[in-house]
Amino acid sequence: VREALESNGIGVNTLTAVCSRGGNIIACPHGAIGIDQEMIDYLTRPEDTAKHASLLGSMIAFDLKKEFGIPACIYDAIGTDEMQAVARVSGVPEIPRYTVGHTLNTRAMAIKCADEVLKKPFDECTFIVAHMGGGSSIRLYHNGVNIDCVNDDEGNFSPERGGAVGCKDLVNYCFTSGNDAKTVMKKFHGAGGLKAHLSTTDAIEVEKMIDAGNEYAKVVYEAMAYGIAKDIA
């Protein structure tokens, strides 16, 4: 971070505030949230939060805050959850639905579209926004609030995620595969999707496979696009 700032002519000691990507703070509102020791303690407890690169942002920002005595915050954390009550209900009472994932990107794109394309305030618009990365999620924003979503582990597969599968098949796999919970989680969250089918998460490489005549790669790639389109619909 220091090298990046200095290479762009910005001295670290000239910062007046620092804002980072937010970690997996469960059920927080959108927007800016101040970073303090309690937040850092929560984000570093393995039983409370999943390991994710976004955790590093708050820790780096907190270090800069302490060193220079400046305000530090996270923004649109991946744990942002504003889902309406009716969307939280699942068919298994012990497992309610919730929002987690790509708030920072999807909300920014919705705000940008409202401002630059529709010329309307974001809080007067309704958007369906698709984030398509290593994991993919779909967000429904209504009047500035993310009222529903398709999380990256409950919709279609993506470059790294296994996506939704039949519950009977999943339960059977968990109890007959001989794998522990950590291994099964990795199969669905990190080693699934394109990675599992084609041994790569790079869509450019997949397109090269298709151009070279790999029919299986073509079917898998089209299946991913088809599934994401269904999630949007």
List where the protein language model places each region:
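General beta-strand structural signal in soluble alpha/beta enzymes
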Residues: 17-20, 71-77, 128-130, 140, ...
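Gly-rich Lys/Arg/Thr-decorated short loops/hinges at beta-loop-alpha junctions or inter-strand turns
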Residues: 41-43, 88-93, 208-216
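Glycine-rich phosphate-binding loop plus the immediately following alpha-helix
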Residues: 55-63, 74, 89, 94-126, ...
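Short acidic/polar capping segments at secondary-structure boundaries
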Residues: 77-82, 133-136
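Adenine-nucleotide phosphate-binding core of ATP-dependent small-molecule kinases
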Residues: 186-233
